[in-house]
């Protein structure tokens, strides 16, 4: 086994090992699990499970085989009205107002109603951003839901914040909004597919229901269920395709069974002789 000091070095070390053997002499296993998935597995916990945090670390309070019920987590929706001259919502449009709505916790309806923050003529962007941050902090949702938030709402708010030289702090940790991944395009089953940028919050979850297939089909409860089964945090899982979510579940199950997972398992299988076929 090869240990690395930082998870970000894992793929580089794996590529180095393979290249030393001219990509033929060595096999590499267990590189695929995401750092968060590996960390939660090592801690013996799953997303959305109850834990105790103490000086001794993180202790699970429930077993994986126990009957599980989705927890009640508070939710709020955020929508930014930013339209161009043709009335189309776009991140480059002028922000007129933002609406924050309490959606309850999945068991009972919201009691805090809606807050509308207007960008009136002559108002400074700094004042608008500060009021939005205060509203989110006061409502304090566990999950912030948007529709096209990764594509429109957050880019528009970030543009306004940067124009006034300030940060956008909508998470509980009071840190700047994190751009975890820029928009990328790749080929999938013969089609060119675009994966939108990923804007993450710290201390609360951002789920873009306008871009998440799993979120649209299964709702928040479905995301929680899949998150628990796969070991992938809900905020990350909402950006995955169904196929990637299934792969994550398989990897988690392999880790639990103590089975090594070949790296790049979608690579064409090497030729085997008769003896290898019998052993396999």
Predicted regions and their residues:
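The two-metal-ion catalytic cores of nucleic-acid processing enzymes
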Residues: 1-280
């Amino acid at each position: 086994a090869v240990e690395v000091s930082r998870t970000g070095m894992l793929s580089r070390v794996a590529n180095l090992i393979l290249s030393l053997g001219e990509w033929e002499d060595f096999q590499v296993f267990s590189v695929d699990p995401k750092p968060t998935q590996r960390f939660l597995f090592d801690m013996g916990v799953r997303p959305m499970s109850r834990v105790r945090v103490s000086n001794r670390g993180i202790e699970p309070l429930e077993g994986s085989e126990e009957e599980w019920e989705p927890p009640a987590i508070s939710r709020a929706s955020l929508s930014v009205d930013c339209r161009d001259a043709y009335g189309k919502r776009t991140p480059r449009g002028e922000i007129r107002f933002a609406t924050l709505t309490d959606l309850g916790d999945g068991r009972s309806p919201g009691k805090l109603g809606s807050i509308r923050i207007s960008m009136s003529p002559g108002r400074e962007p700094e004042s608008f951003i500060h009021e939005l941050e205060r509203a989110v902090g006061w409502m304090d949702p566990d999950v912030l839901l948007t529709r096209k938030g990764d594509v429109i709402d957050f880019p528009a708010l970030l543009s306004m914040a940067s124009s006034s030289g300030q940060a956008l702090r909508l998470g509980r940790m009071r840190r700047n909004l994190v751009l975890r991944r820029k928009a990328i395009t790749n080929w999938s089953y013969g089609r060119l597919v675009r994966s939108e940028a990923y804007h993450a919050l710290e201390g609360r979850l951002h789920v873009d229901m306008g871009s998440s297939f799993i979120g649209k089909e299964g709702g928040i409860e479905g995301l929680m269920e899949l998150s628990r089964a796969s070991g992938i945090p809900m905020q990350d899982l909402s950006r995955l395709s169904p196929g990637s979510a299934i792969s994550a579940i398989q990897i988690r199950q392999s880790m639990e069974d103590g089975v090594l997972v070949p790296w790049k398992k979608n690579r064409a299988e090497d030729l085997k002789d008769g003896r290898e076929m019998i052993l396999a």
